[in-house]
């Protein structure tokens, strides 16, 4: 009986350690998902705002990349370990020639496709 409890406890701990990884669906996610949020903010500046989310996550809003009337605005979902779970452009400029977007260029994600 004790061995069953120990085995079940082991399975429970193993499952508790599992997390769902966000699959990168764009160059920003490919470049930044799983990276330290501190590295992002050190390279590009502090966020505009932060909001507490579910499960210990924090939603940060960042804006920068001001060049010739263009800017980039993204939302970063950061876990309690201060790693980026997801990054999403909410204000971006598409390249009319089909190249990388303004946010992809500014946030070093143009080659992350």
Residue ranges and their predicted role:
Residues 1-8:
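Bacterial N-terminal signal peptides that target proteins for export
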Residues 19-113:
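Residues within mature, well-folded domains
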């Amino acid at each position: 009986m004790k061995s069953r409890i120990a085995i079940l406890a082991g399975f429970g701990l193993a499952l508790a350690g599992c997390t769902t990884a966000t699959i990168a669906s764009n160059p920003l996610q490919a470049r930044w998902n799983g990276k330290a949020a501190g590295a992002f903010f050190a390279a590009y500046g502090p966020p505009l705002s932060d909001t507490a989310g579910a499960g210990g996550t924090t939603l940060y809003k960042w804006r920068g990349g001001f060049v010739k009337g263009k800017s980039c605005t993204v939302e970063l979902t950061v876990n309690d370990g201060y790693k980026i779970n997801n990054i999403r452009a909410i204000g971006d400029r598409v390249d009319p020639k089909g190249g990388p977007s303004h946010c992809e260029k500014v946030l070093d994600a143009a080659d992350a496709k």
